[in-house]
Amino acid sequence: MKHQLLSLSLFCLLGSACAQNVLTVCNLPECPAQHASLASALEAASPGDIVQLLPSPLNYGDATVAIPITIQGGGHVADPLSGAYAKIGTISVTTSDLRVEGVYLRAVTLSPSAGEVIENVEVINNRFYGSGNFVSTGNAGTNDGTKNWSVQGNVMTPDEAPNSTPIFTVSERDTSWSIDHNYIDQYWPFQRVLNGGGPVGEEHALLFHHNLVHTGTSGAFSNSGGLNASCHSNLFWVVDTAYSFMPSSATSTSFVNNLMYSPMGPLTNPDESYENVMNEAPEFVSVSGGVPVWNVDSDYSLAPGSPGIGDGLNGSDVGLFGDLFSFNNSGVPPGLPTFTSISKAYEIVPVNAPLEVEVEWNAGQ
Protein backbone atom coordinates (compact mmCIF):
# COMPACT_ATOMS: atom_id res chain seq x y z
CA MET A 1 0.00 0.00 0.00
CA LYS A 2 2.86 2.41 0.73
CA HIS A 3 4.04 1.98 -2.86
CA GLN A 4 0.59 2.89 -4.10
CA LEU A 5 0.21 5.86 -1.77
CA LEU A 6 3.56 7.21 -2.92
CA SER A 7 2.44 7.11 -6.54
CA LEU A 8 -0.82 8.82 -5.65
CA SER A 9 0.90 11.64 -3.82
CA LEU A 10 3.24 12.19 -6.77
CA PHE A 11 0.35 12.22 -9.25
CA CYS A 12 -0.24 15.93 -8.69
CA LEU A 13 3.25 17.28 -8.09
CA LEU A 14 4.16 17.98 -11.70
CA GLY A 15 2.81 19.98 -14.61
CA SER A 16 0.35 22.75 -15.29
CA ALA A 17 -2.65 20.63 -14.25
CA CYS A 18 -1.54 21.08 -10.64
CA ALA A 19 -1.77 24.86 -10.55
CA GLN A 20 -4.01 26.88 -8.22
CA ASN A 21 -7.59 25.71 -7.57
CA VAL A 22 -6.95 22.00 -8.02
CA LEU A 23 -8.91 19.84 -5.60
CA THR A 24 -7.46 16.33 -5.31
CA VAL A 25 -9.72 13.40 -4.47
CA CYS A 26 -8.85 9.89 -3.31
CA ASN A 27 -11.30 7.42 -1.77
CA LEU A 28 -8.63 5.11 -0.30
CA PRO A 29 -7.80 5.11 3.43
CA GLU A 30 -4.79 7.19 4.46
CA CYS A 31 -4.48 8.66 0.98
CA PRO A 32 -2.73 12.05 0.72
CA ALA A 33 -5.51 14.00 -0.98
CA GLN A 34 -7.67 16.97 -0.03
CA HIS A 35 -10.96 15.10 -0.29
CA ALA A 36 -12.05 11.53 0.36
CA SER A 37 -15.05 11.58 -2.00
CA LEU A 38 -16.12 13.17 -5.26
CA ALA A 39 -19.21 14.61 -3.54
CA SER A 40 -17.05 16.38 -0.95
CA ALA A 41 -14.84 17.92 -3.63
CA LEU A 42 -17.82 19.13 -5.66
CA GLU A 43 -19.32 20.74 -2.58
CA ALA A 44 -16.07 22.60 -1.89
CA ALA A 45 -15.31 23.55 -5.50
CA SER A 46 -15.70 26.99 -7.01
CA PRO A 47 -16.35 27.85 -10.67
CA GLY A 48 -13.28 27.18 -12.79
CA ASP A 49 -11.70 24.69 -10.39
CA ILE A 50 -10.20 21.35 -11.40
CA VAL A 51 -11.42 18.35 -9.43
CA GLN A 52 -8.66 15.81 -9.94
CA LEU A 53 -9.47 12.15 -9.22
CA LEU A 54 -6.48 10.05 -8.21
CA PRO A 55 -6.20 6.42 -9.34
CA SER A 56 -8.15 4.02 -7.13
CA PRO A 57 -9.54 0.47 -7.34
CA LEU A 58 -12.78 1.84 -5.82
CA ASN A 59 -15.52 3.49 -7.89
CA TYR A 60 -16.04 7.17 -7.07
CA GLY A 61 -19.77 6.79 -7.77
CA ASP A 62 -22.35 9.06 -9.41
CA ALA A 63 -22.34 12.84 -9.18
CA THR A 64 -24.45 15.85 -10.10
CA VAL A 65 -22.40 18.82 -11.30
CA ALA A 66 -23.97 22.23 -10.78
CA ILE A 67 -20.99 24.59 -11.26
CA PRO A 68 -18.62 25.07 -14.21
CA ILE A 69 -15.55 22.97 -13.39
CA THR A 70 -13.23 20.32 -14.83
CA ILE A 71 -13.41 16.74 -13.58
CA GLN A 72 -10.09 15.15 -14.46
CA GLY A 73 -8.47 11.75 -14.15
CA GLY A 74 -5.05 10.61 -15.24
CA GLY A 75 -6.30 8.52 -18.18
CA HIS A 76 -8.47 5.43 -18.52
CA VAL A 77 -5.64 2.88 -18.59
CA ALA A 78 -4.26 1.56 -15.29
CA ASP A 79 -1.55 3.77 -13.86
CA PRO A 80 1.78 1.88 -14.06
CA LEU A 81 2.64 2.67 -10.43
CA SER A 82 -0.66 2.13 -8.62
CA GLY A 83 -2.22 -0.35 -11.06
CA ALA A 84 -5.47 1.63 -10.99
CA TYR A 85 -7.36 4.44 -12.74
CA ALA A 86 -10.13 6.84 -11.74
CA LYS A 87 -13.51 5.17 -12.26
CA ILE A 88 -16.82 6.93 -11.74
CA GLY A 89 -20.50 6.30 -12.41
CA THR A 90 -22.86 8.75 -14.14
CA ILE A 91 -22.24 12.49 -14.29
CA SER A 92 -25.54 14.39 -14.31
CA VAL A 93 -25.10 17.85 -15.82
CA THR A 94 -27.04 20.91 -14.64
CA THR A 95 -24.57 23.64 -15.63
CA SER A 96 -22.78 25.03 -18.66
CA ASP A 97 -18.99 25.11 -19.11
CA LEU A 98 -18.17 21.64 -17.80
CA ARG A 99 -15.25 19.45 -18.86
CA VAL A 100 -14.90 15.73 -18.06
CA GLU A 101 -11.59 14.16 -19.10
CA GLY A 102 -9.28 11.25 -18.51
CA VAL A 103 -11.64 9.02 -16.50
CA TYR A 104 -13.34 5.65 -16.81
CA LEU A 105 -17.06 6.29 -16.48
CA ARG A 106 -20.56 5.07 -17.19
CA ALA A 107 -22.23 8.14 -18.70
CA VAL A 108 -22.61 11.90 -18.98
CA THR A 109 -26.28 12.88 -19.04
CA LEU A 110 -28.28 16.08 -19.09
CA SER A 111 -30.29 16.37 -15.89
CA PRO A 112 -34.08 16.68 -16.27
CA SER A 113 -33.89 19.58 -13.81
CA ALA A 114 -31.63 21.67 -16.04
CA GLY A 115 -33.85 24.72 -16.53
CA GLU A 116 -31.84 26.53 -19.21
CA VAL A 117 -29.84 25.77 -22.33
CA ILE A 118 -26.70 23.93 -21.18
CA GLU A 119 -23.74 25.07 -23.30
CA ASN A 120 -20.06 24.31 -23.75
CA VAL A 121 -19.80 20.83 -22.27
CA GLU A 122 -16.65 18.88 -23.20
CA VAL A 123 -16.39 15.10 -22.80
CA ILE A 124 -12.83 14.28 -23.80
CA ASN A 125 -10.36 11.38 -23.54
CA ASN A 126 -12.56 9.09 -21.44
CA ARG A 127 -13.48 5.43 -21.62
CA PHE A 128 -17.09 4.42 -21.15
CA TYR A 129 -18.49 1.20 -19.70
CA GLY A 130 -22.05 -0.11 -19.39
CA SER A 131 -24.82 -0.68 -21.92
CA GLY A 132 -24.82 2.66 -23.75
CA ASN A 133 -26.41 6.12 -23.67
CA PHE A 134 -22.89 7.20 -22.83
CA VAL A 135 -23.63 10.84 -23.67
CA SER A 136 -27.34 11.50 -23.49
CA THR A 137 -29.70 14.48 -23.46
CA GLY A 138 -32.85 13.26 -25.19
CA ASN A 139 -34.49 11.57 -22.21
CA ALA A 140 -34.46 14.69 -20.03
CA GLY A 141 -38.05 15.83 -20.44
CA THR A 142 -38.10 19.25 -18.76
CA ASN A 143 -34.83 20.82 -19.85
CA ASP A 144 -34.37 23.49 -22.52
CA GLY A 145 -31.75 21.64 -24.54
CA THR A 146 -28.05 22.02 -25.20
CA LYS A 147 -25.61 23.89 -27.43
CA ASN A 148 -21.92 23.50 -28.26
CA TRP A 149 -21.25 20.07 -26.77
CA SER A 150 -17.99 18.41 -27.80
CA VAL A 151 -17.41 14.65 -27.46
CA GLN A 152 -13.82 13.87 -28.48
CA GLY A 153 -11.16 11.23 -28.11
CA ASN A 154 -13.27 8.78 -26.13
CA VAL A 155 -13.34 4.98 -26.19
CA MET A 156 -16.89 3.61 -26.15
CA THR A 157 -17.13 -0.15 -25.68
CA PRO A 158 -20.56 -1.35 -24.47
CA ASP A 159 -20.17 -4.35 -22.18
CA GLU A 160 -23.59 -4.76 -20.54
CA ALA A 161 -27.16 -5.56 -21.61
CA PRO A 162 -29.69 -4.45 -22.78
CA ASN A 163 -28.45 -4.62 -26.33
CA SER A 164 -30.92 -2.06 -27.66
CA THR A 165 -29.41 0.90 -25.79
CA PRO A 166 -27.97 3.46 -28.25
CA ILE A 167 -24.47 4.89 -27.91
CA PHE A 168 -25.75 8.50 -27.99
CA THR A 169 -29.21 9.97 -27.46
CA VAL A 170 -29.90 13.54 -28.53
CA SER A 171 -33.08 15.56 -29.00
CA GLU A 172 -34.62 18.28 -31.14
CA ARG A 173 -33.47 20.77 -28.49
CA ASP A 174 -29.77 20.08 -29.07
CA THR A 175 -27.68 22.04 -31.56
CA SER A 176 -24.06 22.72 -32.55
CA TRP A 177 -22.75 19.36 -31.38
CA SER A 178 -19.49 17.75 -32.47
CA ILE A 179 -18.87 14.03 -31.94
CA ASP A 180 -15.41 13.38 -33.31
CA HIS A 181 -12.26 11.27 -32.98
CA ASN A 182 -13.94 8.60 -30.87
CA TYR A 183 -13.49 4.83 -31.00
CA ILE A 184 -17.01 3.36 -31.02
CA ASP A 185 -17.73 -0.34 -30.75
CA GLN A 186 -21.30 -0.94 -31.89
CA TYR A 187 -21.28 -4.36 -30.32
CA TRP A 188 -24.94 -5.37 -29.87
CA PRO A 189 -27.27 -6.41 -32.74
CA PHE A 190 -30.06 -3.92 -31.96
CA GLN A 191 -27.82 -1.08 -30.86
CA ARG A 192 -27.65 2.21 -32.76
CA VAL A 193 -24.89 4.79 -32.73
CA LEU A 194 -27.22 7.79 -32.78
CA ASN A 195 -30.73 7.97 -31.40
CA GLY A 196 -32.82 11.12 -31.63
CA GLY A 197 -32.86 14.11 -33.92
CA GLY A 198 -31.60 17.66 -34.14
CA PRO A 199 -33.82 20.76 -34.30
CA VAL A 200 -36.50 20.61 -36.96
CA GLY A 201 -35.46 22.68 -39.96
CA GLU A 202 -31.87 23.17 -38.79
CA GLU A 203 -29.63 21.31 -41.18
CA HIS A 204 -26.54 19.57 -39.81
CA ALA A 205 -27.11 20.46 -36.16
CA LEU A 206 -24.73 17.63 -35.26
CA LEU A 207 -21.30 16.93 -36.74
CA PHE A 208 -20.15 13.30 -36.56
CA HIS A 209 -16.65 13.10 -37.96
CA HIS A 210 -13.26 11.36 -37.77
CA ASN A 211 -14.61 8.51 -35.68
CA LEU A 212 -13.74 4.83 -35.98
CA VAL A 213 -16.94 2.77 -35.77
CA HIS A 214 -16.53 -0.99 -35.45
CA THR A 215 -19.69 -3.08 -35.62
CA GLY A 216 -19.71 -6.58 -34.20
CA THR A 217 -22.99 -7.56 -35.81
CA SER A 218 -25.74 -6.34 -38.12
CA GLY A 219 -27.58 -3.17 -37.24
CA ALA A 220 -28.05 0.44 -38.24
CA PHE A 221 -26.30 3.73 -37.68
CA SER A 222 -29.46 5.47 -36.48
CA ASN A 223 -33.07 4.65 -35.74
CA SER A 224 -34.18 8.25 -35.95
CA GLY A 225 -36.03 10.35 -38.43
CA GLY A 226 -34.79 13.90 -38.94
CA LEU A 227 -31.34 13.32 -37.45
CA ASN A 228 -29.93 16.48 -39.07
CA ALA A 229 -26.37 15.19 -38.89
CA SER A 230 -23.33 15.68 -41.08
CA CYS A 231 -21.26 12.49 -41.04
CA HIS A 232 -17.87 12.95 -42.66
CA SER A 233 -14.35 11.53 -42.57
CA ASN A 234 -15.36 8.53 -40.46
CA LEU A 235 -14.07 4.99 -40.82
CA PHE A 236 -16.79 2.34 -40.64
CA TRP A 237 -15.71 -1.29 -40.28
CA VAL A 238 -18.95 -3.22 -40.75
CA VAL A 239 -19.26 -6.96 -40.16
CA ASP A 240 -22.63 -7.47 -41.86
CA THR A 241 -23.31 -6.12 -45.36
CA ALA A 242 -26.96 -5.61 -44.38
CA TYR A 243 -25.93 -2.76 -42.08
CA SER A 244 -28.13 0.31 -42.60
CA PHE A 245 -26.27 3.60 -42.54
CA MET A 246 -29.25 5.88 -43.05
CA PRO A 247 -32.91 5.00 -42.50
CA SER A 248 -35.23 6.22 -45.23
CA SER A 249 -36.88 8.61 -42.77
CA ALA A 250 -33.64 10.36 -41.75
CA THR A 251 -33.86 13.74 -43.45
CA SER A 252 -31.14 16.40 -43.64
CA THR A 253 -28.46 13.82 -42.94
CA SER A 254 -25.41 13.40 -45.14
CA PHE A 255 -22.52 10.93 -45.42
CA VAL A 256 -19.53 12.66 -47.02
CA ASN A 257 -15.96 11.43 -47.53
CA ASN A 258 -16.21 8.42 -45.24
CA LEU A 259 -14.51 5.05 -45.68
CA MET A 260 -16.95 2.14 -45.42
CA TYR A 261 -15.71 -1.43 -45.51
CA SER A 262 -16.95 -4.92 -44.72
CA PRO A 263 -14.82 -8.06 -44.98
CA MET A 264 -18.02 -9.99 -45.76
CA GLY A 265 -18.80 -8.33 -49.08
CA PRO A 266 -19.68 -5.05 -50.81
CA LEU A 267 -21.57 -2.26 -49.09
CA THR A 268 -23.88 0.22 -50.82
CA ASN A 269 -23.02 3.90 -50.68
CA PRO A 270 -25.62 5.41 -48.32
CA ASP A 271 -25.42 8.81 -49.96
CA GLU A 272 -24.89 8.67 -53.72
CA SER A 273 -24.84 12.46 -53.95
CA TYR A 274 -21.46 12.53 -52.19
CA GLU A 275 -18.19 10.66 -52.44
CA ASN A 276 -17.42 7.92 -49.95
CA VAL A 277 -14.60 5.38 -50.21
CA MET A 278 -16.49 2.11 -50.54
CA ASN A 279 -15.34 -1.48 -50.05
CA GLU A 280 -11.61 -0.87 -49.71
CA ALA A 281 -9.79 -2.26 -46.66
CA PRO A 282 -8.49 0.65 -44.57
CA GLU A 283 -5.07 -0.90 -43.69
CA PHE A 284 -4.04 0.07 -40.16
CA VAL A 285 -0.49 0.38 -38.85
CA SER A 286 -0.84 -2.32 -36.18
CA VAL A 287 -4.17 -4.05 -35.56
CA SER A 288 -4.39 -7.73 -34.70
CA GLY A 289 -5.71 -9.71 -37.67
CA GLY A 290 -6.55 -6.46 -39.43
CA VAL A 291 -9.83 -6.23 -37.47
CA PRO A 292 -10.09 -3.04 -35.39
CA VAL A 293 -11.49 -4.42 -32.13
CA TRP A 294 -10.42 -2.26 -29.21
CA ASN A 295 -6.99 -2.97 -27.78
CA VAL A 296 -4.94 -0.36 -25.96
CA ASP A 297 -1.77 -1.71 -27.60
CA SER A 298 -3.10 -1.42 -31.16
CA ASP A 299 -2.20 1.42 -33.50
CA TYR A 300 -5.28 2.56 -35.42
CA SER A 301 -3.33 5.01 -37.57
CA LEU A 302 -3.67 4.43 -41.29
CA ALA A 303 -0.73 2.57 -42.82
CA PRO A 304 1.11 4.08 -45.80
CA GLY A 305 -0.90 3.43 -48.94
CA SER A 306 -4.24 3.19 -47.11
CA PRO A 307 -7.19 4.34 -49.26
CA GLY A 308 -8.32 6.48 -46.33
CA ILE A 309 -5.29 8.77 -46.41
CA GLY A 310 -6.33 12.18 -47.68
CA ASP A 311 -9.85 11.02 -48.50
CA GLY A 312 -11.60 12.72 -45.60
CA LEU A 313 -13.21 16.13 -45.89
CA ASN A 314 -10.81 18.86 -47.05
CA GLY A 315 -8.05 16.31 -47.67
CA SER A 316 -7.82 15.02 -44.10
CA ASP A 317 -7.35 11.34 -43.30
CA VAL A 318 -10.43 9.37 -42.33
CA GLY A 319 -10.64 7.87 -38.85
CA LEU A 320 -9.16 8.74 -35.48
CA PHE A 321 -6.02 10.52 -36.61
CA GLY A 322 -7.38 12.86 -39.24
CA ASP A 323 -7.82 16.58 -38.64
CA LEU A 324 -6.18 18.39 -35.71
CA PHE A 325 -7.25 16.43 -32.61
CA SER A 326 -4.58 14.23 -31.02
CA PHE A 327 -6.17 10.87 -30.12
CA ASN A 328 -4.31 8.74 -27.60
CA ASN A 329 -5.19 5.18 -26.58
CA SER A 330 -4.74 5.76 -22.85
CA GLY A 331 -6.88 8.89 -22.56
CA VAL A 332 -4.23 10.96 -20.78
CA PRO A 333 -5.35 14.62 -20.76
CA PRO A 334 -3.09 16.96 -22.75
CA GLY A 335 -0.36 18.50 -20.64
CA LEU A 336 -0.75 16.08 -17.73
CA PRO A 337 2.52 14.30 -16.85
CA THR A 338 2.35 10.51 -16.62
CA PHE A 339 4.65 8.35 -14.55
CA THR A 340 6.51 5.53 -16.23
CA SER A 341 8.70 4.09 -13.45
CA ILE A 342 9.92 4.51 -9.89
CA SER A 343 13.00 2.91 -8.36
CA LYS A 344 15.34 3.34 -5.42
CA ALA A 345 18.34 5.54 -6.08
CA TYR A 346 20.81 3.23 -4.33
CA GLU A 347 20.95 -0.53 -3.96
CA ILE A 348 22.01 -0.34 -0.30
CA VAL A 349 20.36 2.00 2.22
CA PRO A 350 22.07 2.44 5.62
CA VAL A 351 20.04 1.88 8.77
CA ASN A 352 17.93 4.95 9.68
CA ALA A 353 18.99 6.70 6.48
CA PRO A 354 16.33 8.30 4.24
CA LEU A 355 15.22 6.32 1.21
CA GLU A 356 15.86 8.17 -2.02
CA VAL A 357 13.90 7.24 -5.12
CA GLU A 358 14.18 8.02 -8.80
CA VAL A 359 10.99 8.80 -10.69
CA GLU A 360 10.60 8.93 -14.46
CA TRP A 361 7.66 10.43 -16.29
CA ASN A 362 6.48 11.67 -19.64
CA ALA A 363 6.03 15.41 -19.67
CA GLY A 364 2.61 15.29 -21.33
CA GLN A 365 1.44 16.32 -24.78
Tell where the protein language model's regions lie, with residue ranges.
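Bacterial Sec-dependent N-terminal signal peptides
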Residues: 1-22
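Acidic Gly/Asp/Thr-rich repetitive segments characteristic of extracellular carbohydrate-active
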Residues: 21-59
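Acidic glycine-/aspartate-rich tracts in secreted/extracellular proteins
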Residues: 28-31, 49, 55-58, 75-78, ...
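Well-ordered beta-strand segments characteristic of repetitive beta-sheet solenoids
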Residues: 51-53, 70-74, 98-102, 122-126, ...
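Right-handed parallel beta-helix/beta-spiral solenoid domain characteristic of secreted/periplasmic
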Residues: 62, 68-113, 130-132, 159-160
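Predominantly extracellular beta-rich ligand-binding scaffolds that present long acidic/polar faces
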Residues: 66, 112-115, 156, 162-296
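C-terminal accessory segments
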Residues: 274-333
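Short, compositionally biased P/S/T/A/G/V-rich stretches that sit at domain boundaries
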Residues: 318-355, 360-364
